[in-house]
Design a protein with these regions (language model features):
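Gram-positive cell-envelope targeting signals
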Residues: 1-26
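Early extracytoplasmic/lumenal segment of secretory-pathway proteins
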Residues: 26-117
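A generic structural micro-environment signature
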Residues: 7-8, 63-67, 94, 130-133, ...
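A structural signal for short loop-to-beta-strand junctions that line the ligand-binding cleft
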Residues: 39-43, 103-107, 125-139
Length: 139
């Protein structure tokens, strides 16, 4: 399960970022504030009763407070995928929880030094770029 984290991390990051307004020729309006490019099949998982468990730093993804866009809600509406979004306050607490096996997350978003440590300990899997349709735009 831990080996899926890296692949799903980038997939979710790309998808969540894509849920922000884009300025492309063809777009799909998700909400009044969110539109996405129509060159991807965002609905391909609808009806499959999927849940994505995300473990991230607090305040990394806007939640609709202070007139911001609720990115998770927009992603759920667009894709039909339920997101369980949990936050942590330090790399060390995140690492300890994952290492102990007390948690089962699909996507974890640690800082750079912790990513290196987790890779060295075999906790992360290589990314499968064929599952990331926008990967050619990543520098």
């Amino acid at each position: 399960m831990m080996k899926r984290i890296a692949a799903l991390l980038l997939t979710l990051a790309v998808a969540l970022c894509a849920a922000l307004p884009v300025f492309a020729a063809g777009t799909i309006e998700v909400t009044e504030d969110v539109s996405v490019s129509d060159d991807y099949d965002w609905t391909r998982f609808q009806g499959q009763n999927l849940t994505l468990n995300v473990y991230n730093w607090g305040e990394y993804i806007s939640n609709g407070s202070d007139d911001s866009v609720d990115v998770v809600a927009a992603f759920e509406k667009l894709t039909g995928i339920k997101v369980n979004y949990t936050t942590f306050d330090s790399n060390e607490s995140m690492y300890a929880k994952l290492k102990s096996g007390a948690a089962n997350y699909d996507v974890v978003i640690p800082s750079d030094y912790m990513v290196a440590k987790m890779i060295a300990e075999g906790m992360l899997a290589p990314l499968d770029y064929s599952n990331i349709p926008n990967s050619q735009n990543i520098d």
